[in-house]
Amino acid sequence: MERTFLMIKPDAVQRNLIGEIISRIERKGLKLVGGKFMTVPQSLAEEHYAEHTDKPFYKHLISFITSAPVFAMVVEGEDAVHVARHIIGKTNPSEATPGTIRGDLGLTVGRNIIHGSDSVESANKEINLWFKADELSEYSESRESWLYE
């Protein structure tokens, strides 16, 4: 099964949306295999967003992501990266489809609720950056036979 990294950002944590977001992800068939509630250290934020270093929003992004706790998680399922990206919606909430997390709950592009890996390669990199191997669980759910052929 494929895994992907998701991070519920400070704006969603402050708005008490963690449960709502996880519920939507699980209802779509993705299984939570790791999670942690944490304040992001500056060094981790900088490494995670290293590809944006030269962009004008970089300093604001680092400041925002380290300003309050996040809920970092790893989910697993068939085509997990694609499924999660579909549930999340477009980066800008005003362009996101209603029914997606950002379409329903996001406020602005700078307060867009959640981060999700954009490829299998990014997912693997981000999972290894945020989680140690022993922080992730391997288990079966009874519903799996109902979800996957």
From Swiss-Prot:
GO biological process, one term: GTP biosynthetic process
Broad EC category: transferase
Catalytic center residues: H115
EC number: 2.7.4.6
Subcellular location: Cytoplasm
A cellular-component GO term for this protein: cytoplasm
Protein family per UniProt: Belongs to the NDK family.
HAMAP family, per database record: NDP_kinase (MF_00451)
Protein name: Nucleoside diphosphate kinase
